[in-house]
Amino acid sequence: MEHHIRYDAAQRALILLDQRLLPTRQEDFVCRTTEDIVTALQVMVVRGAPAIGVTAAWGCVLAAYEAAEAGDHWHPVLDGLLERIAKARPTAVNLRWAVDRMRKVWKTAGHAPFATLISLWESEARRIHRDDIEINRAMGRHGAALIDEGDTVMTHCNAGALATAGYGTALGVIRGAVDAGKKISVIANETRPFLQGARLTAYELHEDHIPVTVACDNACGHLMRKGMVQKVVVGADRIAANGDAANKIGTYSVALLAREHGVPFYVAAPLSTIDRNTPDGDHIPIEDRTPREVTHVGDTQITPDGVPVYNFAFDVTPAALIAGIVTEVGVLRPPYTESIAEAFRKAGLE
């Protein structure tokens, strides 16, 4: 499943599989402008930190074509469009990371002709896209060692191929274990209110013939108490320098339950998701989404008119609850301030 984000150079379009419609319908959402990209990000046509980063990189290419219509004044126009993309969603650090990486290419190009910049940016976006798949497969190999034969692994939200350029982070670890010949099964928490676990994780694993059972979010403690969960593996949208990890709302509760029941809790994320400029989880911005995602199921209203809603998209799991962070350079262990710094040195990213 590596074709849900496709760039068509001839059409100057980014073609996204519309994840809002899965698993019952498979339709494309075509982006030709900056606003198309921003809309796709905000309404979650595409979601998941690495996939958001890849989409943003290709969005920069579309923004360049759009800015070219301003003639000689395209530089400031392009700058504004890039910032519009970078601010589309606040929590996933890969969004700003990808835009900044494209900006760096622009800066290096200096006053090169527009056609040269487009060529450089298409190459860089393609590299970001390709590298993400390779990074996820590396994480899968490292993380597979954490999963034992016969394990049932719980995961929350969707950190699979659909949340990345391909293969997945948390689901990459699960796929890595299966590729290593281990017979395992998965519990996918439904993940209210957007139901990424029920709709997307179950869809991916079922398509790959990996045994998966969907559980309502409130069943986590019961399942662990009954000994039905041996490991928990989740993804992350931003990891602070101290190892605190922001992931889909409800992850913190799962981590607390895992500690109570002695179930190892792991986070799988590329180094690009680690924000060393954010000291701890208290400094991670948390997106507050539209109340309608909670007040309605489809077109059916389920709450009384006028009742306020909390719809935080993410929460922060403290580093103390995380047994290990699976990255492309290996599994990081506490104390994370030290192991994160060492991982960046190992990757040559100091």
UniProtKB/Swiss-Prot annotation:
Pathway: Amino-acid biosynthesis; L-methionine biosynthesis via salvage pathway; L-methionine from S-methyl-5-thio-alpha-D-ribose 1-phosphate: step 1/6. Keywords: Amino-acid biosynthesis, Isomerase, Methionine biosynthesis. InterPro entries: IF-2B-related, IF-M1Pi, IF_2B-like_C, Initiation_fac_2B_a/b/d, M1Pi_N, NagB/RpiA_transferase-like. It comes from the Bacteria. One of its GO terms (biological process) is L-methionine salvage from methylthioadenosine. GO terms for molecular function: S-methyl-5-thioribose-1-phosphate isomerase activity. It holds the Pfam family IF-2B. Its EC number is 5.3.1.23. The record marks 157 as: Transition state stabilizer. Gene3D superfamilies: translation initiation factor eif-2b, domain 1, Translation initiation factor eif-2b, domain 2. The active site is at residue 237. It catalyses: 5-(methylsulfanyl)-alpha-D-ribose 1-phosphate = 5-(methylsulfanyl)-D-ribulose 1-phosphate. Substrate binds at residues 47-49, 89, 196, 247-248. Belongs to the eIF-2B alpha/beta/delta subunits family. MtnA subfamily. Catalyzes the interconversion of methylthioribose-1-phosphate (MTR-1-P) into methylthioribulose-1-phosphate (MTRu-1-P). This is Methylthioribose-1-phosphate isomerase.
